[in-house]
Amino acid sequence: MCIRDRIRTYLKNRTNLRLTEIVTMAGGEDCKISKTQIMDGIIPIERHGIDRHSYVFCIGGGAFLDVIGLSAATAHRGVRLVRFPTTTLAQDDSGVGVKNGINAFGKKNFIGAFAVPYAVVNDFQFLYTQSDHNNRSGLSEAVKVALVKDGVFFDWLEENVEALHALKPAALEEAVERSAILHARHIALGGDPFETGSSRPLDFGHWTAHKMEQLTDFELSHADAVSVGVALDTLYSARCGWLAEEDAWRAVGLLRGLQLPVWHESLDLRDGEGRRLVYRGLEEFREHLGGELTVLMLEGVGQGVDRHSVDEALHEACIEELKTASQEGIPT
């Protein structure tokens, strides 16, 4: 049975809901740079008289959820959105969040809005429609949140790395569920769901990731960029003396064990004065949140700490170290 038939069957037996239209649109990161896709999401809402007591069901990956979420948040200043994330990355992270947005001016999520979804349905069946690479790469956010929030979960990821690499259903589904719960719990109980302050621990490694995505014209996936960013800031935390060296290499080893990248060639791009372009991402990251630059680093597995500067020379040494490890194929 195709997805359209499944949707119709699901809603047929729910007499209090009336299906108006099933709309298929393009997904992937390209949809976040489209100048028309937000309106493409709004037009059916207007056409069918969808009101603030109606629902938009959105089925897709993280980028698609971001765009249609913004459409729903904008129409009537907010139509109820029910998310059905279809990828590992969306199910274990962004799908349970409160952010919606698109890329603009070459910057990640420059246009967007905070809007709490009415509901999120993580159906594991969707994961088995994805490529092996997509399913593995989405685990970068699980590694991230474990490093920041839950050392026991990190230990579990290490212990189950072979099963996760092989995409064994029981391991994959448990990793996704535990990651989603940690993300949702922080948003709901962390005290700043709409990021009015200057700290955002769930964006560990993301200042690098977002800039690398931009430098590659968004050809580098968010999941892979996060893997590199997490590896870099974890090693940097150790080089600054905040995190044990052994723990830093445990994290890098876990990412490598999941067949995820810990370095990317975009890190070698430099301006005319020889400064790595990725470091422009620090100011863009600060501007996006506002206030003082605040980047999360690690002082233990499962324990993050806010810092307000990055020593570029020391960080560069980490880039070079991970580049060497990556080129030599060392599963550190």
Regions found by a protein language model. Name each.
Residues 12, 16, 116-119, 125-132, ...:
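Generic secondary-structure signature for well-ordered alpha-helical cores
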Residues 50-82:
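Active-site and donor-binding regions of nucleotide-sugar-utilizing enzymes
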Residues 27-28, 59-61, 204-205:
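Glycine-rich beta-strand-to-loop/alpha-helix junction loops that act as flexible
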Residues 160-274:
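Active-site segments that bind and position negatively charged phosphate/pyrophosphate groups
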Residues 4-55:
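ATP/NTP phosphate-donor binding region
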